[in-house]
């Protein structure tokens, strides 16, 4: 071809299939997509050079079309052959195992025009090892009548003698060894290993007749060839990429002792490739190893040999689809040492292919007859012209004409070849990989079973309780409750309870106290509780808490008892911390220790007073004689009564003018405190903290009340437990906690945990700053060694080791974090979404709180959050802590536009310089109510201004003038007030507002512009583009004035 050519046209011209051409082009470095692709002329020349013989030598179709100038087939290359040795002597057919001859399939009739061998085959030597394959000239095969299947089966019963003279054979010629005179029914000789280089005799498969002589199976009436000798067959090399992995070893008929049944006539030949391709040896004999076989035509690795370079075609089944330029005429008979093979079945629709001329058909693999092939093909058609081949094996293979085993090398034996996955199989695998996991797992139902869950529990926690899959619960929450929740996300109490109702469980949310108790029980620990019977109890001093209204003299009274001056050190003259002291009072000549706890009286320290009432034994309620009962007095009284502790009332400031102690007694009677002199059981003591009068009576009343109503005993030999009264961050000492030991003895070196803080006791200090080595019950001390500042009111206890303390603290932190996440998350509804949208629009003040002690920070936070100046402004505390203001606080405030509030603390290091550089405002306070007042004023200043309308004046329209390029101008008379230019106006007609939000754009007095016109004067008023002005209309002007927020 001179120009471009398509691949399939080149394949037809070269006498090969398109796949071979595509493979050769790939080897030549030319990429071609498919058989319909075109290639350039230089590529065509390169391809023809690679196939010189195929492109020039003529060929004839199998089936009998004579070819002109057929070249003789070259002899096979001599080489070592590994196979079963043939008989040592004798020319008769070899019997199969057991002495029975194997019925063979009749050979095909020679086609018209078939050539005869030009020269007779030479007789071999007596030893097969010395036999050399003779040369033969290809001739056209002669047509002959193919025997019917019944006749073939009958003729297969008797053995046929070996041919002694050349005879016409319906096949392409191939040299065949001629043995000596046959001996019928002679048992086979002992196996003998052939000498390398000799011919490879080997039996054909059952049902395959032997060819090559007159009267043989290739001709009419040919007898069957004996079956193969028993024994395994080694794997032969194969390079067929399309070999089915299901094709296993040959059936037992080719290797075992019993021959298989003959295949059905017309059935497709098993395991054979498409007709017309390179043929491997037929089954039945032991195949040689790769190194002992002659080079295979069409194999991988090198250019395809020309027909002149190829050895005689083996008798195996066909390969690629035949065409008119593909085959050369061959003499009858198989290659030396190789049996003849049957032809492959035809293409679908073209009928079953007949056996190749000169060879018998294959027996089915797997030992069972396969599926029948197509009908006999017409002479001259590729693959046709004879009865159908052998049956197809049940073990699979390729469709449309059988397997391709042998097309590119024998397959199905030894190592299984790789099989291509079909598009359907790949699609199914892909779809199965994309299949979503099924979530329809069954969730166990509960019949009112109770489940205890902590605050902020997740669906995974719920699933652990009911032994279910968390993913199933996620699906239930989504489908039943309509809420998207992950398996590890903290859920609100409402969500957990609704899920329990849906599944039939009663969900009980564990309180923080019970949750902490369960946590300690998991470590074999407990806090509080009754004492064991075998625990030795010792007397302890009473714990007394002083409570009352602000400025009623609580701290001054404690100073009088302790003979100190604490009030002088308090900022603003008010107590802002919980102070714990232990004093010794002499009662009835005996020195008795008493522990006093001072609580703030300001309204913002409610939590401190509540904690003071919980840890105390007796409450001393201080009431000023000149001021009487106040709100914080009632609040402190309620705390004491809620704690169920006895109360002693100290009426202070009795030395002041206007003091009325009797009035105080009368007021407290209304709240259930009846004085002893009034017939009650409450002790009232009149004291003066300034003059230090009545102090001894007060301490005596405390001791008498404690002895009369309390059992003041506690164990001292157990691990210490108590409560953290206060916590602060000391610059030189780190976190410092003021604790009150309630039971046991606290010693230096103990591992302690208090709330979310833990550590080891490094030092202990008393109220005077002196170090102590141990602290017994009812003893307040300052403890150093915590990793963080404990919160005021946290319980502390001693644990066996630091590891346990750390684990308890971490679990408490996780518990609080989950609870906060659950509260902050909530259940999203339309109302909450709208509220969040409104919150995004309103102004917000961000604060960072730093204080000296945890109790003060807590009180300040609670007080600030109670400030309410309206819904337009919000207050958010983004961080709080104990200790000095650090650079980290400044950076956080800079990132969030927050203001830092320092309560009794100062900046640390370069925090001041960083705050100035970042523009962060830092405010310092020492009195809590000053901080509250400033923050409240700041919030009010952030409120949006409120405007109200103020009327300026009215004017009556007397005449309407039309001015070009200006519009209508109202000639008016000012009736009241002032009419100003550029002010807002509205037009009123018959008492109805016609137009509102107008602007007085022009104001003239005659022809002069005027800024304002007063009452009683005439003027011209222009309202811009508004021209609907009529006589007797009233123009009213007004302005918006800002109203201060209160």
UniProtKB/Swiss-Prot annotation:
Q: Where is this region: G2?
A: 573-577
Kindly list the positions annotated as binding GTP. Answer: 548-555, 598-602, 652-655
Q: Matching Pfam families, A to Z?
A: EF-G_D2, GTP_EFTU, IF-2, IF2_N
Question: Positions of the region G3?
Answer: 598-601
What keywords does the record list, in alphabetical order? Cytoplasm, GTP-binding, Initiation factor, Nucleotide-binding, Protein biosynthesis
- Residue stretches of biased makeup (Pro residues): 94-111, 160-176, 188-206, 223-235, 260-281, 304-314
Composition bias (Gly residues) maps to 210-222, 334-414
Cellular compartments per GO CC: cytosol
Region G4: what ranges? 652-655
Query: Protein name, please?
Result: Translation initiation factor IF-2
UniProt source species: Parafrankia sp. (strain EAN1pec)
Q: What does this protein do?
A: One of the essential components for the initiation of protein synthesis. Protects formylmethionyl-tRNA from spontaneous hydrolysis and promotes its binding to the 30S ribosomal subunits. Also involved in the hydrolysis of GTP during the formation of the 70S ribosomal complex.
Q: Where is the tr-type G domain?
A: 539-711
Q: Which gene encodes it?
A: infB
Task: Report residue spans for region: G5.
Answer: 688-690
KW Glycoprotein (keyword) present? no
Where does this one sit in the cell? Answer: Cytoplasm
């Amino acid at each position: 071809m001179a120009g471009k050519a398509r691949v399939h046209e080149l394949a037809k011209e070269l006498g090969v299939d398109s796949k071979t051409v595509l493979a050769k082009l790939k080897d030549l470095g030319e990429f071609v997509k498919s058989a319909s692709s075109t290639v350039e002329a230089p590529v065509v020349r390169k391809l023809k050079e690679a196939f010189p013989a195929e492109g020039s030598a003529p060929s004839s179709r199998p089936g009998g079309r004579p070819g002109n100038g057929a070249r003789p087939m070259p002899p096979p290359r001599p080489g070592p052959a590994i196979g079963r040795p043939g008989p040592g002597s004798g020319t008769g057919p070899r019997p199969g195992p057991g002495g029975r001859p194997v019925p063979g399939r009749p050979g095909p009739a020679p086609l018209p025009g078939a050539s005869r061998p030009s020269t007779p085959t030479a007789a071999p030597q007596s030893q097969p090892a010395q036999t050399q394959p003779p040369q033969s000239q290809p001739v056209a095969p002669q047509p002959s009548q193919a025997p019917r299947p019944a006749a073939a089966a009958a003729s297969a019963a008797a053995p046929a003698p070996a041919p002694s003279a050349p005879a016409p054979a319906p096949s392409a010629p191939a040299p065949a060894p001629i043995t000596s005179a046959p001996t019928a029914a002679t048992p086979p000789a002992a196996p003998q290993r052939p000498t390398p280089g000799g011919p490879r005799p080997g039996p054909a498969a059952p049902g395959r007749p032997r060819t090559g002589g007159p009267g043989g199976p290739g001709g009419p009436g040919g007898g069957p060839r004996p079956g193969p000798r028993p024994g395994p067959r080694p794997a032969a090399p194969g390079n067929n990429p399309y070999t089915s992995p299901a094709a296993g070893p040959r059936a037992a008929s080719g290797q075992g002792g019993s021959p298989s049944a003959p295949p059905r006539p017309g059935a497709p030949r098993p395991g054979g490739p498409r007709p017309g391709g390179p043929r491997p040896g037929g089954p039945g004999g032991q195949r040689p190893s790769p190194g002992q076989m002659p080079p295979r035509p069409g194999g991988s690795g090198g250019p395809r040999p020309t027909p002149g370079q190829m050895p005689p075609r083996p008798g195996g089944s066909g390969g690629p689809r035949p065409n008119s330029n593909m085959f050369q005429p061959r003499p009858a008979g198989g290659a030396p040492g190789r049996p003849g093979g049957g032809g492959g079945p035809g293409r679908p629709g073209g009928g079953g292919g007949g056996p190749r001329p000169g060879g018998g058909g294959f027996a089915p693999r797997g030992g069972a007859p396969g599926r029948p092939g197509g009908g006999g093909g017409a002479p001259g058609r590729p693959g046709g012209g004879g009865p159908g081949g052998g049956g197809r094996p049940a073990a699979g293979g390729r469709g449309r004409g059988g397997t391709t085993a042998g097309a590119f090398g024998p397959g199905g034996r030894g190592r299984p070849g790789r099989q291509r996955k079909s598009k359907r199989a790949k699609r199914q695998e892909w779809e199965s990989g994309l299949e979503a996991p099924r979530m329809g797992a069954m969730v166990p139902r509960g019949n009112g079973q109770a489940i205890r869950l902590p605050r902020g529990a997740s669906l995974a926690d719920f699933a652990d309780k009911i032994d279910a899959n968390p993913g199933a619960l996620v699906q239930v929450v989504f489908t039943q409750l309509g809420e998207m929740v992950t398996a590890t996300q903290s859920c609100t109490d409402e969500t957990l309870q609704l899920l329990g109702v849906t599944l039939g469980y009663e969900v009980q949310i564990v309180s923080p106290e019970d949750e902490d108790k369960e946590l300690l029980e998991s470590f074999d620990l407990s806090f509080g509780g009754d004492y064991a019977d075998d625990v030795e109890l010792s007397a302890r001093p009473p714990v007394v808490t002083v409570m009352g209204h602000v400025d009623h003299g609580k701290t001054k009274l404690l100073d009088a008892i302790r003979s100190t001056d604490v009030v002088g050190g308090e900022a603003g003259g008010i107590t802002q911390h919980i102070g714990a002291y232990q004093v010794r009072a002499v009662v009835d000549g005996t020195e008795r220790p008493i522990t006093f706890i001072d609580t703030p009286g300001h309204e913002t320290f409610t939590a401190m007073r509540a904690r003071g009432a919980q840890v105390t034994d007796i409450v001393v309620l201080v009431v000023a004689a000149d001021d009487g009962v106040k709100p914080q007095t009632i609040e402190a009284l309620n705390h004491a009564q809620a704690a169920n502790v006895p109360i002693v009332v100290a009426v202070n400031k009795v030395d002041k003018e206007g003091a009325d102690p009797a009035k105080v007694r009368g007021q407290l009677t209304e709240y259930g405190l009846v004085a002893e002199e009034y017939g009650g059981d409450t002790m009232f003591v009149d004291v003066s903290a300034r003059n230090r009068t009545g102090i001894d009576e007060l301490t005596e009343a405390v001791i008498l009340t404690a002895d009369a109503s309390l059992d003041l005993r506690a164990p001292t030999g157990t691990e210490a437990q108590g409560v953290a009264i206060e916590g602060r961050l000391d610059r030189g000492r780190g976190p410092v906690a003021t604790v009150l030991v309630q039971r046991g003895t606290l010693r230096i070196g103990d591992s302690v945990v208090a709330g979310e803080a833990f550590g080891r006791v490094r030092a202990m200090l008393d109220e005077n700053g002196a170090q102590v080595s141990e602290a017994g019950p009812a003893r307040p001390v300052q403890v150093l060694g915590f990793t963080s500042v404990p919160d005021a009111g946290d319980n502390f206890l001693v644990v066996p080791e630091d590891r346990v303390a750390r684990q308890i603290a971490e679990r408490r932190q996780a518990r609080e974090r989950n609870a906060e996440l659950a509260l902050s998350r909530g259940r999203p509804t339309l109302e909450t979404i709208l509220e969040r949208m409104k919150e995004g629009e309103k102004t917000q003040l961000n604060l960072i709180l730093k204080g000296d002690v945890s109790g003060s920070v807590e009180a300040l936070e609670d007080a600030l959050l109670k400030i309410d100046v309206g819904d337009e402004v919000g207050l958010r505390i983004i961080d709080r802590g104990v200790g000095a203001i650090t650079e980290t606080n400044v950076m956080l405030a800079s990132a969030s536009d927050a203001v830092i509030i320092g309560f009794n603390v100062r900046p640390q290091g370069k925090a001041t310089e960083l705050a100035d550089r970042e523009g962060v405002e830092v405010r310092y306070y020492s009195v809590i109510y000053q901080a509250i007042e400033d923050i409240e004023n700041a919030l009010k200043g952030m409120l949006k201004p409120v405007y109200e309308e103020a009327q300026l004046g009215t004017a009556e329209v007397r005449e309407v003038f039309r001015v070009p390029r200006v519009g209508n101008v109202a000639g008016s008379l000012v009736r009241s007030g002032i009419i100003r230019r550029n002010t807002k106006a509205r037009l009123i007609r018959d008492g109805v507002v016609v137009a509102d939000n107008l602007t007085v754009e022009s104001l003239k007095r005659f022809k002069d512009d005027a800024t304002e016109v007063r009452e009683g004067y005439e003027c011209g008023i222009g309202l811009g583009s508004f021209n609907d002005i009529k006589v007797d209309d009233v123009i009213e002007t007004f302005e918006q004035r800002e109203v201060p927020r209160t």
